[in-house]
Structures are given as C-alpha cells and as structure tokens.
C-alpha cells in the first residue's frame, strides 16, 4: 500500500550506501523483512520476452504508464486470455458531460486515455492520459499525456501536460503545469 512504500522510501532515502533504486535496493530490503507475494510474468505463447519495465525512476514509471494508452500496448489490460486482477471500489461509471455544448472550447471528452470509475470529465478535454478513480476534470481544462491519481480535481481553464499528479491534489482554476519548466 502507499503508506508502506512511502515509509520504505523514506528509510532508503536516509541510507548513504543506497542507489535509491526500487529493483536494486528497496524491493530487496522489503523482501528480507516482510512477507511478499509476486506474479511470474511469462509470454503465454513462448514466442518472446515477457513484459517487464523497470519503473525505478519517475521517468521510467511515467513511460510505463503511457505505454498502457497505446492502441495495442505490449501489456494489454484488456486481454481476456491473460487477465490482470486488481481491487476496484464499486463506483459509478465514468461520465462525460458538455461534449455537445455550443461552445467548442467546452468539450467534455477523453481520447486515447484510460478513465477509471467515478471520474467526471465535465466540459474538459483529456488526451493520451490516465485518470485514476474519482478524478474530476472541469470545464475548459486540458489534460494531455498525464497520470492523475485518485480524487484529483482539475479546476476550470487549467492545463496539465506530461505530469504525474498525486492523489487528492486540487489543481486551481487557470493553473498551468508542464508548459514552463521554470514555473513548474
């Protein structure tokens, strides 16, 4: 869970001899001290390599998530023959409103994206992104190539590009993220 990993990240951050890499330092230390479960990823047909991404850095984590929104991702979450099971809260389906608005800037849609249950895209635009459960994208906002965790709220006229937004964050109206390196 998040808290468990966070505590181990903090512990690792204080170690002088650590490279601060998940695969090299953090996961092995967790395995030594805790009961851990794993799933062996194997190529079903035996024709090639199994899917694997080292997500030990933010850039690698971002890239692995962006792989999932491809038309034919290497790790296909929709492959019935190789289901990936996860806990999912019982929430209403995602909702897209104001897509037929007379105002062309008020779109209410998501393209090439994964939108989780409980999300509402209310007059905003989402492109090539992943929206975690109960995210809310308000009117005239634009989210592109980004990962938004649970319960993120994006205010009206906000713009987000190539960002990872932690759960529960509220992006104020008119905020711009990912467009100006100095401001970010």
Task: List where the protein language model places each region.
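Left-handed beta-helix
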Residues: 3, 10-184
